[in-house]
Amino acid sequence: MDGAVLACTDGAVLPVSQVFDAIRELGNGGLEQWDPLVLTSASLLSKLPVDSSSVDFVILIWLSIDCPVDQLIQEILRVLKVDGTILIRKSSQSAVGSFDKIISSLENKLLLAGFTEPQVLQSAGIKAKKPSWKIGSSFALKKVIRSSPKMQIDFDSDLIDEDSFLTEEDLKKPQLPPGDCEIGSTRKACKNCTCGRAEEEEKVLKLGLTTEQIDNPQSACGNCGLGDAFRCSTCPYKGLPAFKLGEKVALSGNFLAADI
């Protein structure tokens, strides 16, 4: 039923003039050329005899004091097309004293049923629209995946030479400071020696040997480095441990120390 108008009432009779008055109230004068379907005693029907989503406008003209039942409003939502309009108004023969007393209840019923944009009319009526979405419908939210910003590398750009940051002072080879115990070409212990050189020199002096004899020991007979068992009585290395010729004689820390 394309471009159809459905008029319902809870009374036994519904004058067609009231239907057209309601159509004009909707601001659709062209609807007068249509043949509205009129249903009486609609409050007694469990289901409206109309296909789903087949009606553009539903006009409900009410006589009784009670508001339209929830089941009837749900049926009107079913038969209306998307963006279809429902108009509920008081009948001219209605026993309702003041429509304002039930208008708030009607508005709540329409919203709870799923209608949108309820609007109270001056002529003791209220209208609303069927939404374009289905009640209880759902859809998946698309998660926006944000990629990390890409770094643009310009291979044509000039590379910086790190050596250009070096000064002439940086390029000079560092010179190590002389040790505390080094004076000229010959190393001697300083006055306040803390490196152990003074103790070594003291041991050499007690033995009566020169520094050259300790650092580079030599032997005319070839037995000086073998130990006291092979040394002669006049050997300058008598009392020292065995050593290799040409290598510095290593003196132990307790050398020349008293046994008791």
Swiss-Prot record:
<feature type="binding site">
    <location>
        <position position="181"/>
    </location>
    <ligand>
        <name>[2Fe-2S] cluster</name>
    </ligand>
</feature>
<dbReference type="InterPro" id="IPR046408">
    <property type="entry name" value="CIAPIN1"/>
</dbReference>
<keyword id="KW-0479">Metal-binding</keyword>
<comment type="similarity">
    <text>Belongs to the anamorsin family.</text>
</comment>
<feature type="binding site">
    <location>
        <position position="235"/>
    </location>
    <ligand>
        <name>[4Fe-4S] cluster</name>
    </ligand>
</feature>
<feature type="binding site">
    <location>
        <position position="195"/>
    </location>
    <ligand>
        <name>[2Fe-2S] cluster</name>
    </ligand>
</feature>
<dbReference type="GO" id="GO:0005758">
    <property type="term" value="C:mitochondrial intermembrane space"/>
</dbReference>
<dbReference type="Pfam" id="PF05093">
    <property type="entry name" value="CIAPIN1"/>
</dbReference>
<dbReference type="GO" id="GO:0016226">
    <property type="term" value="P:iron-sulfur cluster assembly"/>
</dbReference>
<feature type="binding site">
    <location>
        <position position="232"/>
    </location>
    <ligand>
        <name>[4Fe-4S] cluster</name>
    </ligand>
</feature>
<keyword id="KW-0408">Iron</keyword>
<feature type="short sequence motif" description="Cx2C motif 2">
    <location>
        <begin position="232"/>
        <end position="235"/>
    </location>
</feature>
<keyword id="KW-0004">4Fe-4S</keyword>
<dbReference type="GO" id="GO:0051537">
    <property type="term" value="F:2 iron, 2 sulfur cluster binding"/>
</dbReference>
<dbReference type="InterPro" id="IPR007785">
    <property type="entry name" value="Anamorsin"/>
</dbReference>
<comment type="subunit">
    <text>Monomer.</text>
</comment>
<dbReference type="GO" id="GO:0009055">
    <property type="term" value="F:electron transfer activity"/>
</dbReference>
<dbReference type="GO" id="GO:0005737">
    <property type="term" value="C:cytoplasm"/>
</dbReference>
<feature type="region of interest" description="Fe-S binding site A">
    <location>
        <begin position="181"/>
        <end position="195"/>
    </location>
</feature>
<dbReference type="GO" id="GO:0051539">
    <property type="term" value="F:4 iron, 4 sulfur cluster binding"/>
</dbReference>
<keyword id="KW-0001">2Fe-2S</keyword>
<comment type="function">
    <text>Component of the cytosolic iron-sulfur (Fe-S) protein assembly (CIA) machinery. Required for the maturation of extramitochondrial Fe-S proteins. Part of an electron transfer chain functioning in an early step of cytosolic Fe-S biogenesis, facilitating the de novo assembly of a [4Fe-4S] cluster on the cytosolic Fe-S scaffold complex. Electrons are transferred from NADPH via a FAD- and FMN-containing diflavin oxidoreductase.</text>
</comment>
<feature type="binding site">
    <location>
        <position position="224"/>
    </location>
    <ligand>
        <name>[4Fe-4S] cluster</name>
    </ligand>
</feature>
<feature type="binding site">
    <location>
        <position position="221"/>
    </location>
    <ligand>
        <name>[4Fe-4S] cluster</name>
    </ligand>
</feature>
<feature type="region of interest" description="Linker">
    <location>
        <begin position="142"/>
        <end position="171"/>
    </location>
</feature>
<keyword id="KW-0496">Mitochondrion</keyword>
<dbReference type="GO" id="GO:0046872">
    <property type="term" value="F:metal ion binding"/>
</dbReference>
<feature type="binding site">
    <location>
        <position position="190"/>
    </location>
    <ligand>
        <name>[2Fe-2S] cluster</name>
    </ligand>
</feature>
<protein>
    <recommendedName>
        <fullName>Anamorsin homolog</fullName>
    </recommendedName>
</protein>
<feature type="binding site">
    <location>
        <position position="193"/>
    </location>
    <ligand>
        <name>[2Fe-2S] cluster</name>
    </ligand>
</feature>
<keyword id="KW-0411">Iron-sulfur</keyword>
<keyword id="KW-0963">Cytoplasm</keyword>
<feature type="short sequence motif" description="Cx2C motif 1">
    <location>
        <begin position="221"/>
        <end position="224"/>
    </location>
</feature>
<feature type="region of interest" description="Fe-S binding site B">
    <location>
        <begin position="221"/>
        <end position="235"/>
    </location>
</feature>
<dbReference type="InterPro" id="IPR029063">
    <property type="entry name" value="SAM-dependent_MTases_sf"/>
</dbReference>
<feature type="region of interest" description="N-terminal SAM-like domain">
    <location>
        <begin position="1"/>
        <end position="142"/>
    </location>
</feature>
